[in-house]
């Protein structure tokens, strides 16, 4: 709800601006939030390592921007952005930077990172228990950062009726107080990712561990992502996402998420082994 609703609320705050900036390869709801608010949705190119390229943002787009979305670890590529650079970019231009950090607990290359490590002025960090604690059904999350912006969002959002029921709040608070289950889940995702890398490599598909997230971002043989999607479904019973779901820049790639149970993954591994024997 926050991702798709934020542009509308920000436009009420700054009616002279009409643009939402977001990574060119990203969760589709960033773009949809702009569309629902009647804003311009402007994708920001990524570099060769799938990190947002701030230098590619045009001055005229920055001057009209309501916000810049960043996502670390990124979905679908799992790359880690320079959040300090993103915060500095926004402050220099008066553009709020909203950092989607829902996968932060699943950072594999170095320690977890947050935009709040670079100060709170002009930034928001957005978190979700859907990923951290597997509590997607509760629709519980939180944002923190710039005091003025956080206060504004609280005061406007409460009139929309988007209030989390008390039992869901209590469950979310209990989950946030406990880190052990998060560590267990992170270790589980890491094992699953390693197993999926081995499965894909055994099929002749190049794959490697991401910097973060619980998904692999792989090149489709001959650049045909739909052929790979169909092959993995037919041969292994694995459902994947073609890269173009996340934007045109995803052409020729496939996202493979490590979200099946360990028992199901064992079946996939056996099927792959049988094919190679």
Regions found by a protein language model. Name each.
Residues 22, 43, 99, 240-242:
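Hydrophobic residues in well-ordered beta-strands that form the structural core
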Residues 48-109:
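Active-site phosphate-binding strand-loop segment of PLP-dependent enzymes
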Residues 10, 30-34:
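Short hydrophobic alpha-helical segments of the AMP-binding
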Residues 37, 92-93, 203, 236:
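Helix C-cap/helix->beta junction micro-motif
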Residues 119-190, 275-276:
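Conserved core segment of the aminotransferase class I/II
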Residues 1-19:
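Phosphate-binding glycine-rich loop
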Residues 169, 173, 189-197, 207-219, ...:
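Conserved glycine-rich beta-strand-loop-beta hairpin in the small C-terminal domain of fold type I
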Residues 231-240, 246-277:
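PLP-dependent enzyme catalytic core of the Aspartate aminotransferase-like
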């Amino acid at each position: 709800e926050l991702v798709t609703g934020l542009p509308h609320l920000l436009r009420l705050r700054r009616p002279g601006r009409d643009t939402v900036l977001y990574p060119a390869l990203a969760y589709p709801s960033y773009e949809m939030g702009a569309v629902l608010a009647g804003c311009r949705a402007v994708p920001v190119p990524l570099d060769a390592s799938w990190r947002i390229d701030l230098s590619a943002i045009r001055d005229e787009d920055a001057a009209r921007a309501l916000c810049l979305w960043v996502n670390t670890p990124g979905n679908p590529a799992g790359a880690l952005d320079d959040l300090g650079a993103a915060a500095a970019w926004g402050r220099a231009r008066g553009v709020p930077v909203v950092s989607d950090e829902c996968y932060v607990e699943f950072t594999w290359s170095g320690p977890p990172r947050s935009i709040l490590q670079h100060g709170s002025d002009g930034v928001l960090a957005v978190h979700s228990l859907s990923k951290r604690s597997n509590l997607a059904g509760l629709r519980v999350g939180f944002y923190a950062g710039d005091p003025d912006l956080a206060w504004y969002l609280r005061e406007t959002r409460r009139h929309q009726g988007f209030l989390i029921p008390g039992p869901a709040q209590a469950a979310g608070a209990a989950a946030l107080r406990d880190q052990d289950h998060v560590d267990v889940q992170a270790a589980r995702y890491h094992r699953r990712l390693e197993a999926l890398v081995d499965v894909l490599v055994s099929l002749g598909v190049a794959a490697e561990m991401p910097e973060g997230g619980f998904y692999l971002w792989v090149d489709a043989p001959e650049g045909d992502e739909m052929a790979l999607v169909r092959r993995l479904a037919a041969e292994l019973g694995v459902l994947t996402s073609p890269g173009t779901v996340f934007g045109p820049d995803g052409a020729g790639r496939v996202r493979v998420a490590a979200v099946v149970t360990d028992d199901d993954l064992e079946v996939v591994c056996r099927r792959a082994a049988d094919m190679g024997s």
